[in-house]
Structures are given as structure tokens and as C-alpha cells.
């Protein structure tokens, strides 16, 4: 026995002195990296190569290790490998196809990685050769299209989408990725739509398909005609649009669920008990610890669908059971891909068909509700750059929705009432609202709640001016619709008025600090004009005459804030400083608010003196207001119900370029080609002839 151990030891010692044996595929890669054509000595070289398990790390690493000159010496072999990969995609043997797809991924990534450090290095020439590029890419795109549309292997479809995502995201700025010109010419748009319109393929590949489409839409969108934009804008197939909506809703629901789970876990833990003991002193820190990474890729897809396709607006209101409440048996899938920005798409559709009988006991939801909940989480904390971008994109999407006539129709529909549990930022001075006490209301109430919540919770040193302006614009556009269509919305308008006045107070108390960074008068003017909208047209859209009385009560009650604002803008408009013009606009806009204050205040004081009351109740003030409307004179202000429509190209191009760059980087970082193990593939393709 001791002798056997000794022999074993000797064997180990001798083997340690030798170099580890290279696997055959690595030896074959080494032959490709020689200047000679590897098929000269081995006529079956390319045929054998695609039967070997791909070694992605070695192939990519080898490409990265060569300098530009060395790489150019083996260009013919690289071109040959690329062309044989494309040929292999047409093979009957699935293993060859899988290996060809993975090899293409490694080639594209490896050559692009090399390009970052080599100036004047042309990727198309290096991969395919200029003379063959057009035909190569045509054949590649046709093969991918066929594989995606075929009824074959789901694993192959998954790899095809990953190859396309790899192709699109190899450069941070996708508009500089010249290979995408061929993806524009040889469109795979219909293949993407087919995936989204069929429930089985949507369950497996919907997420990757939607992200891919969102990225392709953003290729040189401002410089040239992008066929994916044109085609997306005219899609009217209900199954396809609903499929896209479901994929987006599931990804956002998954985010909402993850956040809720972390929140509950956090609240039930030791830290929660500690914060309760010390009066929630550390509530901000506690909140930061339960943040979940945002999913900007899926949000971009939602934006493009809402912005480009008017038919998609109907999908926002498509009712279905709330995804978090419905459980469905999940069949084991061969892969669980890690998706960009840390969100894994649900492995099964909550809804298997467009039409679904609804259980009266199950809370119904829709894509818009899911999006509003997502927005309420993301918009809580805008200090982080990703959340700031996500918060901005949420407000841009809401802007597009608030401008759409059909969207407004269902937002304000009294027959479409929902209970929407928005997340509210933990704040020391208010109690957590009980979700069960929320009433069922038209969806516009939830949008307004979200805007009020944002206004109240972001008055801070690092003031998000851009987000505030967008928030007020959303409110204004909704009011314009209500005025135009005479919609009398039963909403707690007082909460909005109070939030707006508190925002004005914040702007005034932080005048010096804020003016160093922002033109606060733009925002102040918008707030004042919202009040002017209520004053001038409130009788056409406020729910009751008493609501209009309450508006006047709030203005009179908070008259000191409006007086202080007037003093501030008057001071700056009479000085010859940079804010003169901006401040004077606010001065003029305050004319009716000041008229109300100056008209009613003396009458209230007189009423108090006559009746020997030191402090009037709300009802007594309202009594004075109602008795003195007739003698109030107001000026008619033009343009209060007009607004500039949203335009991406002129104002938002820089934001979207940066956002797409960030998404591209994250998609590339999270692409997982190893989710398909060779064992799984061999099991799936066990019938290789």
C-alpha cells in the first residue's frame, strides 16, 4: 500500500514539472493565430472546430494579447474564421450552430476590445474584410433571423439574441458602431415582434428582445432615418403590443417586488428597532440601505414605445391581475440569464393570453400602475446618478402620457378606478399610510399623488431643479386636459396647493444658495401660473363650488408666502441684475393672487373686529369669501392653458445619448454566454446524427 502511495507521489511530482496539456480547441485556436491557413494541413479543420466546446476566455484573451500589427498579419485567418462561423449557422447540427454563435461573440468582443487601444484600426475590415463585409453581414443577419423565427431550440434563440446584444453594445456609444449599419439594412425587426407576440417565446426571450429593440431604435436616431424607429411607430398588432407591455410590466413588477421584500426585511430587523428607539434619527441612512439597482434598459423600452407608437397607449390601461398576487407554476428553464442592471426577468408570464377572466377578489392592475409604483420608488432618492437618470426618464414618460388625448381619457375615466399603493419616502413628521385604506380612484389621482409626493420630499440642498420643472409641467398638462374637457376630478386639491406653497417658501428661504446654481424664477413662475390656472378656470374643472372656495381660503391663509415672494421678485426686477427679466415675469403673474389677498384680507379683519373674534375658523373665513366674490376684480391672463409639446430631438438628445451609453455598458457587462453549459446543450441536442 505504501508502495502505491509512493508511486502516486512520484507521478504527481513528475507531472508537476510538465506544462499542463492544452485542450484540442485551444491548439486549434493557436493555429488560427499563425499566419498560415490552418486548413492547408488539415482539410477538415473548420468542420472539426465547430464540434469543439468553445473556450471564450482563451479566444478573447488571445485577441487582446496581440498588438495591431500582429493582428493585421493574421487578418486573413480571422476573416476566414468569421466566414466559417456564418456558414456553420446554416448547419443541421445544433452543436455546430451553438459553437459558431459563441465563437462570433468572442471574435466581435475581442476585436472591439483591441480597437480601444489601437488608433486607425478598422473593425469591419479586421473581422470580415471590406470586400466581403456586405455579403457576410447579409448572410449573418439572415441566419439569425431564421433561427429566431424557427420553431426550434429555445437555447439557440437565446444565444442569437445574446450575439445581437453583443454586436450592438461592443462600443459604449452605439452610434459609433459602424457594424450596425448592416443591422439597419438587414432588419430583424419582424423577428423581434414575433418573439413578443407568441407567449412561449416571449416567456423565454421577451426581456432580451425588448432591450435589443430599445437599443437599435437609438442607433444614430438624430443623424439619419432609422428603420427600427419607423417600423416601431406603425406597429398596430394587438398581440405584439400587449406582449411588449407584458415584458416591461414584468420587469418593473420584479423590481417593485425586490424593493418591497428588502423594505419588509429591513423594517423587521434590528436596525428598524434601533431607529424606533432613537426617534428615527437615521431614517435616511436606513432608506439608502434598501435601494435596489434601477433598470434603465426596460424603462428606455417603455419610453420608446410610449413616445413613438400611439397604439401602445392602449396597452398602458390593459387590465390584468396584480402580478405580485398571482402565482403560476414555473417550469424549469435551461437558462436563467442575468439581465442588465441586476434585474432578472420573471421566468414565466403571469398572463398567458391577452383576454383573461378577472377574479373579483384579486386586485387588478395594469402597466401604468406598475410603472407609477416603480416611479414612486426610483424618484425617492435622486442623489445616485442612476436613480437621477431613472427619475428623469420616469417624468419624461409621464410627460408624454399627460400630452396624449387617449391616455388622458382613460386616466380621467370614472369607470376605471384602481387602488394604487405608491411608495412614500419615510419622513419623521408623517405616519406611514395604511395601504388598505386607499380608495379606488381614477388613475390620474395616482399620477397627481406621485407629483405631490415628489414636490414634498425633494426640497434639499442638492436641489433637482430639472426634475421639479418636469413635475410641475406634468401637473399643468393634466389641468389643461381637465379644463378643456371640463372634467371635474374628485381629488384632494388642497394637498397639491399646500405642496406648491411650501415649495415657493423653500425657494425664498434658500434664495442665495439656489440662485448661484439655478434660475429659480422659471420654477416660481410655473407654480404661480398653476394657481392662476385654478383661479381663472377652476370653476370649470374643480369638483364642487366649495373646492373653489377652499382655493381662495388657502391663498388667503398663506398670504404671507405670496407677499414675501412678491417682495423678492419686485426687489430683483427693479435692480439691473441678471434676474431682472425673469423676476419681472413673476411680478406680473402675481397680479390676481395679490388682488385676492388685498380684496379679502381687509374684509376678514373687519368681520373679526365686528364680531369680536381674535382668530377666525376656516368656516368663518369661507363665509366672508363667499359673501365678497361679487366685488372682486381679476385680470384675464392669456395662455394659461397653453403649453409647449415635448420634443426629444431639440431638448433631450444629450440626455438620451448619455443614458443609452450607460445602458450599453451595463448590458455588455452583464451578458452571460456561459448560462448555456455544454452539458445542458448536449442534453437538449441529444439527437445529433
Swiss-Prot record:
It is found in: Golgi apparatus membrane; Cytoplasm. This is Armadillo-like helical domain-containing protein 3. Pfam families: ARMH3_C (PF08427). The chain crosses the membrane at residues 520-538. GO terms for biological process: regulation of Golgi organization. It comes from Homo sapiens (Human). Belongs to the ARMH3 family. The keyword Membrane applies.
Amino acid at each position: 500500500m505504501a508502495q502505491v502511495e509512493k508511486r502516486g507521489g512520484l507521478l504527481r511530482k513528475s507531472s508537476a514539472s510538465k506544462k499542463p496539456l492544452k485542450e484540442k480547441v485551444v491548439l486549434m485556436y493557436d493555429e488560427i493565430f499563425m499566419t498560415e491557413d490552418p486548413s492547408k494541413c488539415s482539410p477538415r479543420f473548420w468542420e472539426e472546430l465547430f464540434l469543439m466546446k468553445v473556450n471564450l476566455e482563451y479566444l478573447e484573451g488571445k485577441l487582446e494579447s496581440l498588438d495591431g500589427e500582429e493582428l493585421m498579419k493574421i487578418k486573413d485567418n480571422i476573416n476566414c474564421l468569421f466566414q466559417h462561423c456564418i456558414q456553420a449557422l446554416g448547419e443541421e447540427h445544433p452543436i455546430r450552430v451553438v459553437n459558431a454563435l459563441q465563437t462570433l461573440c468572442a471574435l466581435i468582443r475581442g476585436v472591439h476590445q483591441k480597437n480601444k487601444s489601437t488608433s486607425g484600426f478598422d473593425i469591419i475590415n479586421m473581422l470580415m474584410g471590406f470586400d466581403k463585409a456586405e455579403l457576410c453581414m447579409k448572410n449573418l443577419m439572415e441566419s439569425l433571423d431564421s433561427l429566431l423565427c424557427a420553431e426550434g431550440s429555445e437555447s439557440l434563440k437565446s444565444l442569437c439574441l445574446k450575439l445581437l446584444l453583443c454586436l450592438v453594445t461592443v462600443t459604449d456609444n452605439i452610434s459609433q458602431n459602424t457594424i450596425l449599419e448592416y443591422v439597419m439594412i438587414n432588419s430583424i425587426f419582424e423577428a423581434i415582434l414575433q418573439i413578443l407576440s407568441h407567449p412561449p417565446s416571449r416567456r423565454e426571450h421577451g426581456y432580451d428582445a425588448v432591450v435589443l429593440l430599445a437599443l437599435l431604435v437609438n442607433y444614430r436616431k438624430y443623424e439619419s432615418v432609422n428603420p427600427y424607429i419607423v417600423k416601431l411607430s406603425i406597429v398596430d398588432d394587438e398581440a405584439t403590443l400587449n406582449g411588449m407591455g407584458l415584458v416591461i410590466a414584468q420587469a418593473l413588477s420584479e423590481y417593485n417586488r425586490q424593493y418591497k421584500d428588502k423594505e419588509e426585511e429591513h423594517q423587521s430587523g434590528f436596525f428598524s428597532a434601533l431607529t424606533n428607539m432613537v426617534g428615527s434619527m437615521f431614517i435616511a441612512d436606513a432608506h439608502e440601505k434598501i435601494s435596489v439597482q434601477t433598470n434603465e434598459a426596460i424603462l428606455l423600452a417603455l419610453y420608446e414605445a410610449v413616445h413613438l407608437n400611439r397604439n401602445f397607449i392602449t396597452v398602458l390601461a390593459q387590465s390584468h391581475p396584480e402580478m405580485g398576487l398571482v402565482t403560476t407554476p414555473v417550469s424549469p428553464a435551461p437558462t436563467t440569464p442575468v439581465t442588465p442592471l441586476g434585474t432578472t426577468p420573471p421566468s414565466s408570464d403571469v398572463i398567458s393570453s391577452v383576454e383573461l377572466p378577472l377574479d373579483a377578489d384579486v386586485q387588478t392592475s395594469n402597466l401604468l400602475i406598475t410603472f407609477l409604483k416603480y416611479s414612486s420608488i426610483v424618484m425617492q432618492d435622486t442623489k445616485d446618478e442612476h436613480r437621477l437618470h431613472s427619475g428623469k426618464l420616469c417624468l419624461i414618460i409621464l410627460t408624454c402620457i399627460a400630452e396624449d388625448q387617449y391616455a388622458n381619457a382613460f386616466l380621467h375615466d370614472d369607470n376605471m378606478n384602481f387602488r394604487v399603493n405608491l411608495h412614500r419616502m419615510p419622513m419623521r413628521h408623517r405616519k406611514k399610510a395604511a395601504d388598505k385604506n386607499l380608495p379606488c380612484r381614477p388613475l390620474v389621482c395616482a399620477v397627481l399623488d406621485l407629483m405631490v409626493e415628489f414636490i414634498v420630499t425633494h426640497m434639499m440642498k442638492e436641489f433637482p431643479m430639472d426634475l421639479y420643472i418636469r413635475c410641475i409641467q406634468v401637473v399643468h398638462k393634466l389641468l389643461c386636459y381637465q379644463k378643456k374637457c371640463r372634467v371635474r376630478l374628485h381629488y384632494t386639491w388642497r394637498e397639491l396647493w399646500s405642496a406648491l406653497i411650501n415649495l415657493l417658501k423653500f425657494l425664498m428661504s434658500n434664495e442665495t444658495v439656489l440662485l448661484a446654481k439655478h434660475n429659480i424664477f422659471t420654477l416660481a413662475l410655473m407654480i404661480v401660473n398653476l394657481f392662476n390656472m385654478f383661479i381663472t378656470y377652476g370653476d370649470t374643472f374643480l369638483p364642487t363650488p366649495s373646492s373653489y372656495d377652499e382655493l381662495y381660503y388657502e391663498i388667503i391663509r398663506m398670504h404671507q408666502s405670496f407677499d414675501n415672494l412678491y417682495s423678492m421678485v419686485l426687489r430683483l426686477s427693479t435692480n439691473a441684475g441678471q434676474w431682472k427679466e425673469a423676476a419681472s415675469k413673476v411680478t406680473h403673474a402675481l397680479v390676481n393672487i395679490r388682488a385676492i389677498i388685498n380684496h379679502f384680507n381687509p374684509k376678514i379683519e373687519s368681520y373679526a373686529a365686528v364680531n369680536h373674534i381674535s382668530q377666525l375658523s376656516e368656516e368663518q373665513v369661507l363665509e366672508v369669501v363667499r359673501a365678497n366674490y361679487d366685488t372682486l376684480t381679476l385680470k384675464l391672463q392669456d395662455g394659461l392653458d397653453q403649453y409647449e409639446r415635448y420634443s426629444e430631438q431639440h431638448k433631450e438628445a444629450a440626455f438620451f445619448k448619455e443614458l443609452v451609453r450607460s445602458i450599453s455598458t451595463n448590458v455588455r457587462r452583464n451578458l452571460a454566454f456561459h448560462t448555456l453549459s455544454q452539458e445542458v446543450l448536449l442534453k437538449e441536442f441529444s439527437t445529433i446524427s
